[in-house]
Amino acid sequence: MRTATVTRNTLETQITVSLNLDGTGVGRFETGVPFLDHMMDQIARHGLIDLDVKAVGDLHIDAHHTVEDIGITLGQAFAKAIGDKKGIRRYGHAYVPLDEALSRVVIDLSGRPGLVYNVDYTRACIGQFDVDLFSEFFHGFVNHSMVTLHIDNLRGHNSHHQAETIFKAFGRALRMACEHDERMAGITPSTKGTLSV
């Protein structure tokens, strides 16, 4: 089983993330940021990843530290769970629509962190959630999971739909990249022979 639990404590946040990459999509979230919980549930369900996230943060200031640090901790847990990456597909991609919105996410479990994020939300906030924090979440994830991630919202005029298509596509792309490829059994999917340097 490809599982990991990571706890990260700072003066700003206390976070524990547990995940199972070979799960059934069960999500449990206690972060104090309801819309982020809703989005992470999309990752779990569409990625078929069992994901448990508990966070206490300085929400009396705003959600910035909590959202960013959850991304960091999720990235650390993912890197631990995926291991040496032998026998996996490595690359994943997904297009996901929701009514008028359409997003594309492409991921490479390359060992090199990089985020290309092209999203123009039609509103600055979804409820009380500042949409700028999604970029912080994905930056945190990418920098600590050591993956290359391209996120493009291709169209949409409802910000909730824009965000939801991104997170659903991210879950599906992640699922594809993590899948075992029987023809690559025991082989690292790189001409370098490694994805860790």
Curated annotation (Swiss-Prot):
Keyword Cell cycle set for record: no
One GO term (biological process): L-histidine biosynthetic process
Stored Pfam families: IGPD
EC number: 4.2.1.19
Recorded GO MF terms: imidazoleglycerol-phosphate dehydratase activity
CDD domains reported for this sequence: IGPD
Domain of life according to the entry: Bacteria
Chaperone among keywords: no
The protein's annotated pathway: Amino-acid biosynthesis; L-histidine biosynthesis; L-histidine from 5-phospho-alpha-D-ribose 1-diphosphate: step 6/9
SUPFAM superfamilies the UniProt entry points to: Ribosomal protein S5 domain 2-like
GO cellular component, one term: cytoplasm
Catalytic activity: D-erythro-1-(imidazol-4-yl)glycerol 3-phosphate = 3-(imidazol-4-yl)-2-oxopropyl phosphate + H2O
Keywords: Amino-acid biosynthesis, Cytoplasm, Histidine biosynthesis, Lyase
Subcellular location: Cytoplasm
PANTHER family in the record: IMIDAZOLEGLYCEROL-PHOSPHATE DEHYDRATASE (PTHR23133:SF2), IMIDAZOLEGLYCEROL-PHOSPHATE DEHYDRATASE HIS7 (PTHR23133)
Cited HAMAP family: HisB
Family according to the record: Belongs to the imidazoleglycerol-phosphate dehydratase family.
Name of this chain's protein: Imidazoleglycerol-phosphate dehydratase
Organism listed in the record: Chromobacterium violaceum (strain ATCC 12472 / DSM 30191 / JCM 1249 / CCUG 213 / NBRC 12614 / NCIMB 9131 / NCTC 9757 / MK)
Gene: hisB
